[in-house]
Each structure stands twice: as structure tokens, then as C-alpha cells.
Amino acid sequence: MNRPLAIAFTLLVASTAAQSQTQTQTLTQWNFNSVTPDASTATGSLLPNVGSGTATLVGTTGSFASGVGSTDPAAIDNSGWGTSGYATQGTGDRTRGVQFNVSTVGFNLIAVSWDQRLSNTAARSAQFQYSLNGTNFTDFGAVFSGSPGDTWFNNRSVDLSSVAGVGNNANFAFRVVAAFEPLTSAYAAATTSSTYATTGTWRFDQVSVTAVPEPGTYAMMLAGLAMIGFMALRRSR
């Protein structure tokens, strides 16, 4: 293969690779598994296994337990993030749960998904909330309802692509919090034959934020490739 043709082929491959980066990709993900596998689901990590971000508790206490039943493909050492210590019945609507902070700088068309397990006495309704400044949160969409308890509800998802300010935002954050049943002032237990209790638990796994690079990012990639091609052709003469 002559030099100009080799250069053209290389640029074509690089351009195809760059274009693939404009497709939806996982920006950040938490699988809550131990960074160093230890064959114990009672241990885990709040560090993302993909990308960067922080996971924190909102008025609850946390622990690690088995993630078996979620979409996590890990065959062993599959942990989930368990939470308990939810509000007394009739109080604290949408104030307790979990929070995740993820910078979306350079990305748009943001979407969030997660797997969630509810114990029998846990609140069956969960509200998704988002924040543009990491402090003030806004409800988004209807509550997620899950029944019966002791069950994983996988691939819960929200599409935030229509919300101005979510993309390209260093302070983007979101929460999943326990909610009263719609049009009531009380929590309902995940299993209808059970009674809601503050000791009920929620467990999370495979919390993921997906996004698409902004057009400007792709344009810079192509500009860089064009410059590489120009310099390579110049040297080949």
C-alpha cells in the first residue's frame, strides 16, 4: 500500500472511531461491587465502575448486600447498595433516599437508569428528582411503583433530554426518594399484606447515566483529524 493510500485508510478508520463517539455512551455507572473482588456481597464500593461521580445517602443509612436479581452481569461478588432508616409513616414525603452527582460537561441528551429492590415493608413508591445546581431538586415524571416486595424492579429509567440545563452541567445531580402514595399522605408497603415500616429497605444496582457528546466535541475531533491528515500528506511529499 503506497503512503498516501495508507494515510487515507488510517484517517478513515480514525474518523469512523470518532463518529462512533457521537452515539449514546455510558457517562457514569455504579455497580457497587468491591473494587478488588473479595467474594463477599456484604462489602462493596460507592466509587463508580465507569466514569466519575459521587453517591450519597439522603436521610438514610447504607450497607451492602447481594445484587443477585439485578441486571449486573457479575457472576460473583455482585453487591447492591442497601438503604434503610426511612421516615415515620405520614412524614418526610420525598425527603429520604439516595443522591448521585455527575458532571455532564461536554455531553447532552442525558438519561438515567437503575435497578431497585424493595423489601416487603419498604415504601412502594419512588420519586425521581433532578437538580441543576446540586442543591435544589425538582420532581420529574410520575412515581415508580413496585409490588410485591422482595423483588428487583430492573431498568427503571428517565429521559432528561428535554430538560434545559441538564446537559453540559458540572453541577447536575439526581435523587431517588421515598414518596407517599399519589393523592394520599401516607406510604404504602411494597407488599400489600405488609405494613410500611421505617426498617424497610431499598437496594440499588446498576445506576447509570448515559449521554451523547455535544456537537462541538465531535467537530473538534474532526478538526484534529483533518490537521493530522494535512501534516501527514505534507510529509509524504
PLM regions and their residue ranges:
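Extended extracellular/luminal ectodomain segments enriched in beta-structured repeat modules
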Residues: T104-S113, N169
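Extended, low-complexity, turn-rich repeat/linker tracts enriched in Gly/Pro/Ser/Thr and Asp/Glu
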Residues: G106, R117-R124
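Conserved Ser/Thr-centered positions that define the repeating blades of beta-propeller domains
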Residues: F128-S131
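A short, hydrophobic C-terminal helix/tail in secreted or cell-surface proteins
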Residues: E214-L233
